[in-house]
Amino acid sequence: MKFAIFGDIHANLEALQTVLWDAQEQGCSNYVCLGDIVGYAANPVECLQAVQDLGCPVVRGNHDEGAASESSLEELNPLAQNALLWTREQLSEEQRLWLRELKLVRQVRDFTIVHATLDSPGNWGYVTNRFDAMASFSYQFTQVCFYGHTHVPRIFEKDDAVRAARGTDVLLQRGVKYFVNVGSVGQPRDGDWRAAYAIYDVQAQTISIRRLEYDIETAQGKIRAAGLPSLLADRLALGK
């Protein structure tokens, strides 16, 4: 059994379609979404529908929450605010309700999923180093937890200490916990513009991060055509 685990789509339909196609080619039979389906790019409705059509477990991200609420969005940067105000106008009330009702944390089979952190999932903190990871490990009751939010693929391990694993592929070891950032489908920020997602092979007990080229020019063109800030289109090619 293989799980395709993905998140931070951010309304980038071209990237999402590429990830879902690749997951099928890799033999994935199950899908899990770590949130932030919407925000930044120009296809929030289509991306939301694609995730809903999968019928898979989903957790709420901060951009999902922003799009579904009537809050001022003052905690977000101006680019994110601009995109979310536009996104609110695109989504139906039914779609916004669906986003509002998503849980912050879920257990799927033998692993946990969250968008940001386990210690305070609704405060949208970032796990970028082993000290951040320590706090989430304290609330992790499964061997593996998958998360997103930073848009940077990373694997943290915990046995008698917490450390960042080398690379983004791992063979699970007995007695070790793993806190795994699967990267971003639609807006990577690690200097690599390619879409990212993870495959968890239950039988082989492996987790691997895949990177995929997609039709970035079309995604950029849609952002500009929608009247969204051009910087949101430009940054896709920079991977930041």
Show where each model-derived region lies.
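Active-site environment of divalent metal-dependent phosphoester hydrolases
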Residues: H10-A15, G39-A41, E65-A68, D119-P121, ...
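Core catalytic region of metal-dependent phosphoesterases/phosphodiesterases
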Residues: K2-R96
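Hydrophobic/aromatic beta-strand patches that form the interior of the parallel beta-sheet core
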Residues: V32, P57-V59, V114, F146, ...
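His/acidic metal-ligating clusters that form di-metal
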Residues: G27, Q90-K158, K240
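Short, conserved loop/helix-junction motifs that constitute active-site signature segments
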Residues: Q52-L54, S138-Y139, L172-R174, Y200
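Active-site-proximal beta-strand elements of phosphoester/diester hydrolases
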Residues: K2-H10, D110-T117, F179-G183
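Acidic, His/Gly-rich catalytic cores of divalent-metal-dependent hydrolytic chemistry
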Residues: K158-K240
